[in-house]
């Protein structure tokens, strides 16, 4: 996980617009925790699964920063997470996440 955090922390600060209109600093840990929470419910989280989750988180964060450098709405983050899970054929994980 250290490599993931090091790579992600080099990205510029991004703000997230919440459903109630508040703007907060983007926190990659929230995505990571949500993916792990969903994974815990549908599979054994082995070191291999942990590696896949880290790779997914990295792809999700990269996509968010590339598409929304000026700020992102919370529903856009959710759409990207769902899309990346489906692209990775992580159907059970996607269903639990949704």
Residues of each region from the PLM?
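Long, C-terminal-biased catalytic regions of enzyme "large/alpha" subunits
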Residues: 1-98
């Amino acid at each position: 996980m250290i490599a993931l955090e090091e790579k992600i922390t080099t990205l510029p600060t991004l703000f997230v617009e919440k459903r109630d209109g508040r703007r907060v600093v983007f926190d990659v840990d929230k995505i990571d925790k949500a993916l792990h929470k969903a994974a815990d419910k549908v599979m054994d989280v082995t070191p291999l699964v942990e590696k896949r989750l880290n790779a997914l988180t990295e792809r999700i964060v990269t996509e968010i920063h590339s598409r929304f450098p000026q700020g992102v709405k919370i529903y856009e983050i959710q759409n990207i997470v769902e899309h990346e899970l489906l692209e990775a054929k992580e159907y059970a994980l996607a269903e639990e996440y949704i």
